[in-house]
Amino acid sequence: LYALLGNPDVITSESLQTPGLSEQITQLLSGVDRSSGSSDWLKDLFLTGGYDAMVNYECLIISANQELEARGEETLDAVYPYDGLSIADSPLGYVDNGDAEKEQAFLDLQEYLLSDEVQNEIQRTGRRTGYEGVSAENADVFRADWGIQPDRVLSPIRMPSTEVLMECLNLYQTEFRKPSLTIY
């Protein structure tokens, strides 16, 4: 949407009413053959469906390429938007209910997950553990020959308000999204 709207600072409800936007979205999505309930399902569908391209997270492009390469098939080329990325950062949260034992367990888990060893293991799965590149030790996972840019500094887009996000999702679900392939 940002690109179709000329890269505003942030998408607003008013910008969703821009003349011609609906037609541009329809044209853009006309090339979508299948949609999926999750990014991992989409990767699996791509690997079994004989499709030519996939829009997905960097880590799932890497995962798909690892499988394609193991099967001796042509790998995907990663393409990054030049004007900003939507980043899935999966934060870890804790609700303090006054239980010191549970809080300590949470803090221990957090310390473990943030340890160099575990951060390295996470990076080995093709997931970045920070905004500024990857460790030299994991350069073989983030492969330039697949178009992966390990030294790219991630520049996130500014997310719209919750209300505007809900409006965007509603529009997508009701006006633009092709039905899922459902088999009973």
Q: Which sequence ranges carry the predicted segments?
A:
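Extracellular/periplasmic juxtamembrane helices and adjacent flexible linkers that interface
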Residues: 97-182
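Small-molecule pocket liners
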Residues: 2, 88-93
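Residues on a specific face of well-ordered alpha-helices
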Residues: 1-2, 6, 107
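Solvent-exposed loop/turn segments at secondary-structure junctions
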Residues: 6-7, 59-62, 83-86, 97-99, ...
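Ligand-binding pocket segment of bilobal, Venus flytrap-like solute-binding proteins
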Residues: 4-80
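Extracellular/periplasmic catalytic domains that process cell-envelope and extracellular macromolecules
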Residues: 46-49, 70-72, 83-87, 101-104, ...
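Structural recognition of the beta-strand scaffold that forms the well-ordered cores
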Residues: 52-57, 93, 182-183
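Second-shell loop/turn segments in exported
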Residues: 29-32, 95-99
